[in-house]
Amino acid sequence: MANNQKKILMLGGLRYLIPVIQAAHELGYYVITCDYLPHNVAHKYADEYHNISITDKNAVLELAKELKINGIMSFAVDPGVLTAAYVCDKLGLPGNPYTSVQILQNKALFRSFLEKNGFNTPKSRGYNSIEE
């Protein structure tokens, strides 16, 4: 890897990521993938792989700091979107705001957002446990 080559961390390793990895390579990026499944096919196309769950946002953040990445993304892997936003916020990288992604991924938060902003929405209530 050249010293000035930009690094992108891609969360996940499913086959859908292969064309994205190839496009990143064509743009000159050093591509790093991570998830907890080392045999996922897309890892073979990356320059580097790390065995870290994409839902462990703090572990991914530490990896991103260690690797000094220039960008992070989750493509076709919904659980990684929140982690990518978290890392972007913490490292000052371009991306979707963490709070916005939280609202969009949590139905109770999204319905509350709609209601607070004057949208027509059915009455609803979110629950966090069976006891509720």
Each model region followed by its residue ranges:
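Active-site nucleotide/adenylate-binding loops and adjacent lid/helix of ATP-dependent enzymes
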Residues: 103-132
